[in-house]
Structures are given as structure tokens and as C-alpha cells.
Amino acid sequence: TNLAPDSLRAVHPLGRSPVLSTPDGAIAESGAIVEYLVRHYASESFCSPTEGEALQQYLFWLHFAEGSLMPPLVANLVLEKARQKGAKPFFIKPITNKLVDGILNAYYGPNLAQSLRYVESYLASHTWFAGDEPTGADVQMIFPLESLVASGKAKDFAAIQGYVKRVHARPAYQQALAKGGEYAYA
């Protein structure tokens, strides 16, 4: 969104967040940051799967979060902001609203709906995204899913709502909120 301060360019050339400063250099991109933290700091009870189906699911969900689930959410956020912001002559507003609706209904809405159905079907038979315990894949997936639940867009998806409640009930999640503070999901 180009809203990050210029000071981030001193940390990473893109000047965007998130970015993590490590002894080996800066790491940008959420998935890479999560994977780095898991590999370097995770305990036995919170680690990356190393083989089999759990590894396949870990890799899939780790990248699905930002590669498939976040793009329609971000596009929706940006288009809705464009609809609401800025001074528009009264006769232009219906045209911009129709344009935004057309973009959302033709592409982003159907893709988001398809992704939500897929996530819902997976969570209907799995507690976590990659194995019997939470992993970095869950760290990646929680933000878009809790954003959807908070916005009311996941009201018809009981398994997604249950998953978000499970994550929110975890002591580690509560500790993270205590350290980082509450946030509004978008």
C-alpha cells in the first residue's frame, strides 16, 4: 500500500513491512519470516513437519495464505477504500460503485468464495493445517481467517469460525496479544 515509513528502506530495499532483521540480514515476506522463526526458535511442540503428508500440507497452507487467500481480501479492501474515499462529483459515484462491484463480483468474489469453501472443507476434518499440532502454516492462515470472521464474511463457515476460536484460546496467542497489543484485523 506504500504506507510504510521511508525508514523501512534502511532495513530492506523494498521499504515494506513485514521485515525481520536477523544476524544474517533482513528477511522480508511473511512466509519467509515465519519459516525463519520456526527454524531458528521453535520448540519441539511447534516445529515444521519434515516429511509425508504433514510436510505437503504445511508447504501448501504456508503459501496458500498469501498466494491465494490474501489477494482477494486485499483487493476488496483497496476497492472498498476507493469507493469510500476521495471527493467525487455526485454523478461519478454511481459509475465508480458499479465499476467496483463489477470487479469484485466478476473475479475477487468468486475466487474468495472458492477458497473459503476449500478451507472450510479442510478444517471440517482437521484441527490444524499441517498435522496434530499448530505449525507455521497456522501462523500464516490465522490472519486472513480471523479477518474474515471479524468482518462477518465467514458467518456461513462453522469450521473456519471454530478454528479461529481455537487459535484465539491458545495461551501462545494470548501471550502474543499481550506483547504486541490488540489489532483490528485489517
Task: Give each language-model segment a name.
Residues 13, 42, 124, 171-172:
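Proline-centered flexible-loop/turn and helix-kink motifs
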Residues 21-22, 130, 141, 185:
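Conserved hydrophobic "DFG−1" position in protein kinase catalytic cores
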Residues 1-102:
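GST-like domain detector, emphasizing the conserved glutathione-binding G-site
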Residues 173-186:
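Terminal-tail/helix-coil boundary detector
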Residues 62-169:
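GST-like fold's C-terminal all-alpha helical module
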Residues 10, 169, 178-179:
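Phosphate-coordinating loops and pocket residues in cytosolic domains that bind phosphorylated ligands
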Residues 32, 159, 172:
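Residue-level recognition of oxygen-bearing side chains
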